[in-house]
Amino acid sequence: MNSPGLNDSKRLLRAEVVRLIIDGQTELALKLLSDYYGISEPDLKVGTVKRHRRVLACYVQNEKRIYLSKGEYITNPFVILHEYYHHLRSSELGKKRQVEKRADLFASNFISEFVTQQQSNRGGNR
């Protein structure tokens, strides 16, 4: 199932990143993602962090590092991408992009509803 609104190059990027992670080339996948989003790559380390010992993985913002509780998670796309999202959100550029995108969507939804109501009112006056 294709995600609506995605162009072919973004679909290809997503598929390639998942393939790289499954193939054990997680560092390359993180580099590809970071290049795409224009942010630094996070470090990747197998180990645990105090207060987060029971989770599969966690992202530590001040270290810019993804910790995996077990080495086998390095080939798990869901775990890696979930933690990468935290890295993306914590980067200034990532935060700004997400906030701006959400703000644009918020405004667009209001304007779209206004336009729909205006068109409906004009249709009823005929």
Predicted regions and their residues:
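Short amphipathic alpha-helical segments, especially helix-boundary/capping motifs
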Residues: 3-9, 58-59, 79-84
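Short pre-active-site segment immediately N-terminal to the catalytic Zn-binding motif
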Residues: 64-80, 93-98
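Auxiliary, metal-adjacent structural segments of Zn-dependent hydrolase domains
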Residues: 7-67, 71-73, 119-126
